[in-house]
A protein has these predicted regions:
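Conserved, mostly hydrophobic/aromatic
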Residues: 33, 147, 188, 198, ...
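Aromatic/acidic polysaccharide-binding cleft in carbohydrate-active enzymes
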Residues: 150, 372-374, 378, 419-426, ...
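Substrate-binding/active-site clefts of carbohydrate-active enzymes
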Residues: 142, 148-194, 201-319, 323-324, ...
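C-terminal beta-strand-rich structural cap/linker in extracellular carbohydrate-active enzymes
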Residues: 4, 37, 88, 564-578
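The feature marks proteins involved in alpha-glucan
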Residues: 1-30, 52-144, 154-169, 173
Length: 578
């Protein structure tokens, strides 16, 4: 409710869950609250020990909360508390821009300071150490490179006309394999990549391999288990991690369990491995199958993971490849169509084998319910992708809205998760960003700057560094640009420089956001970050014409390695050391 110019009570939101109230470790506790945008002059957190009575010791403390994120309609305030309490009781003190003051505890508002602990929020999460959101220490802000193996590199001669065919079809066999990736490992490393992610490599009859027929076999067209072991070893020698694609939502029709159902029908002992509505099975092209499958594709029947046999089989598969080849992560295909119950057990199983395994979910929307520390570590950040599409490709949002959309995710996601978000501008499931921008390379130039200069794990889709084109799937999966005549060397050097700057100045992605200025009419964004003694201004010009930033002249521009003259060209960026 809004009463004249007074505080907007209905916009205030806090919950005692792992998004708004959680222990980062044994000594650090984070509390957040959401309020109406620009409504508050000051937010103060009051907290005290739940179990020590006042007559014994006064444990009451207060701490000013910092505004850490801004979305379209809300501000997010945060307090980080160093504490050694068994259990915490707390409440908020709000003072709005008109001077009105109110206290908020246990989901109730009060005009007087709260003294009754029963009227405060109660959070014992620092006691429950087994529930703390622990993520792999190696992962935060690392740079990921996505490869579609059949189209990346081949070890046998492939007709050049076929390799660079456009548009390409699912039937075009380019003979890419694991050995080809191994032979180009130096190229991947030289770009500055930290994590290599491959789409499915297990046995399948399709080009994309998302319809698995044998989870325990590398597809023969890609190589052998020994090839995968060598690939992982060579990646590790270069300081890179390897993530594989886990397709556990569905199988292919030739997978042994479904093949048995096709042969034996109702008498099959595997009939409960899937969701079958009736016999005989119907899956002719053009008709809706009478069994659950991925997207009504009869060639991808959905597994019944609530069946203990199926759950064990799939979990054993995941653990097997960790033990066998020492991989570093699983990317979970169609992860949001599988139950929370399964993923909780899955996490326990794979983390027991390798504690610092990275678990990445595929989900195209906000994923807070999967990111509470007991399922996934992070997700493919499609909201980031859609935000950039809206800003640069479709030009339907302002720079202010773009920054606000970024703020929404930061304000809602767990502190440990945010630096692990896989920020992408395209993937094997989307048209290339360049295509969506009508081949405007300047727009991709700027999109890469956003991708590589913001917190998270930027995921570069193979070939983006050479400005590879491509429409929607399957055309986005063309043969990699290995011949210089096809490569955009200027784009490559831009990607490489962005990665170098990102890695050489931790302030860029780890620094606290100390200021944000957006000019909608000009189409410009300036983000100020501070980290210890270093302060950096990141300037993004989202318009087609050059803009002046005279306040930063004579400072050093990390991207050009020259003194900044105050000018930023259209669809360009600058990183200024202050």
């Amino acid at each position: 409710m809004k009463r004249g110019n007074f505080m907007e009570y209905s916009a205030i939101f806090h919950d005692m869950d792992k998004r708004f109230s959680y222990a980062v470790d044994k000594d650090l506790f984070v509390i957040r609250v959401q309020v109406k945008k620009d409504d508050m002059k000051e937010v103060i957190l009051h907290y005290e020990d739940k179990y020590i009575p006042m007559e014994r010791k006064d444990t009451r403390k207060t701490v000013p909360m910092k505004k850490v994120a801004v979305s379209q309609f809300h501000d997010y305030y945060e307090a980080q508390i160093k504490m050694h309490l068994i259990c915490l009781r707390y409440f908020f003190e709000f003072t709005d821009t008109q001077g009105e003051k109110v206290y908020y505890g246990n989901y109730e508002f009060d005009k007087e300071c709260i003294t009754n602990r029963d009227r405060m929020f109660d959070c014992p999460q620092n006691l429950r150490e087994e529930e703390m959101f622990e993520v792999p220490e190696w992962a935060a802000n690392k740079v990921v490179y996505q490869i579609f193996p059949s189209r990346f590199a081949a070890t046998e001669p492939v007709d050049k006309e076929l390799w660079y065919k456009a548009p390409i079809t699912p039937m075009d066999d380019l003979h890419g394999n694991l050995r080809g990736i191994i032979e180009h490992m130096d190229d991947i490393q030289n770009l500055g990549i930290d994590v290599l992610y491959m789409t499915p490599i297990f046995q399948s009859n399709s080009c994309h391999k998302y319809d698995t027929t044998d989870y325990y076999q590398i597809d023969p067209s890609f190589g052998t288990t020994e090839d995968l072991k060598e690939l992982v070893q060579k990646a590790h020698e270069r300081g890179m991690k390897v993530v594989l694609d886990a397709v556990y939502n569905h199988t292919g029709r030739e997978f042994f369990a479904f093949a048995d159902i096709l042969e034996n029908g109702e008498k099959s002992k595997y009939r409960d491995w899937y969701f079958i509505d009736g016999f005989p099975l119907k899956s002719e092209w053009g008709e809706i199958p009478n069994f659950k499958c991925f997207g009504y594709y009869g060639g991808m029947p959905k597994l019944n993971l609530k069946n203990p046999e199926v759950e064990k089989y799939i979990t054993d598969v995941a653990c097997y490849w960790i033990k066998e080849c020492d991989i570093d992560g699983w990317r979970l295909d169609v992860g949001d169509e599988i139950s929370h119950f399964f993923w909780k057990n899955f996490r326990k199983a794979v983390k027991a084998v390798k504690k610092d395994m990275l678990i990445i979910g595929e989900i195209w929307h906000y994923a807070g319910d999967f990111l509470e520390g007991d399922e996934w570590d992070t997700v493919m950040n499609y909201p980031f992708y859609l935000n950039l599409i809206d800003l640069l490709a479709d030009e339907k949002i302002t720079v202010s809205q773009f920054v606000q959309n970024l703020g929404y995710l930061k304000g809602r996601l767990h502190k440990n998760c945010y630096p692990l978000m896989w920020n992408l501008i395209d993937s094997h499931d989307t048209a290339r960003f360049l295509h969506l921008c009508n081949d405007n390379k300047k727009k991709q130039h700027l999109a890469a700057a956003f991708q590589l200069l913001l917190p998270g794990m930027p995921m570069i889709y193979y070939g983006d560094e050479y400005a590879m084109p491509g429409a929607n799937d399957p055309d986005c999966r063309r043969g990699m640009y290995w011949d210089e005549e096809y490569q955009d060397k200027e784009m490559y050097e831009w990607y490489k420089r962005l990665i170098q700057v990102r890695k050489s100045h931790a302030c860029i992605v780890e620094g606290e956001l100390a200021g944000s200025v957006t000019e909608d009419e000009e189409g410009t964004i300036v983000l100020i970050r501070k980290n210890g003694e270093e302060t950096i201004a990141m300037i993004f010009n989202c318009s087609s014409s050059a803009k002046k930033f005279n306040e930063y002249t004579q400072k050093y521009n990390l991207l050009t390695e020259n003194t900044f003259d105050g000018n930023v060209e259209g669809f360009d960026a600058a990183v200024i050391v202050l």
